[in-house]
Amino acid sequence: MDFALTNFGGIRVPLPAGEITLEDISSMFPFNNYMCYCRMTGASLQKLLEQLAATPAFQATSGATVRVKDHRLESALVGGEPIDPERTYHVTTIDFLLDGGDKVNVGALSEEVVLSPVLLRDVMLAYVQDCEARGELVSGKADGRVIML
């Protein structure tokens, strides 16, 4: 995947310090948001990022570094590179954002959409379990992917 997107409104409580339990993950992600895999052009991905910049609060993303000023996208990198309008990008999101949830419409910008039977909370639980199995800590530290001016 080149880019991932979910909505902050779907993340209901912060990640607790210490051991993370199934109850913690269920409280963080209480909605039945199903994972979706989309294919879109760079031109469409650019439009999506512009759409996100125009909203009151940018959503939770991974794989991109963006700079937004006055609700306008100033710059965007995906995988550390400028967006190529001709390239095909692979995007992961949730079904809520496919047709207008939180004023985001990933589906309309996609050339292909594949709905998954897997819930976002299950993906997060698997991630936490994988980190635990490797002896790694899960961090909720902000990493500067989105800069709002």
Describe the residue ranges of each PLM region.
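Feature captures C-terminal
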Residues: 1-149
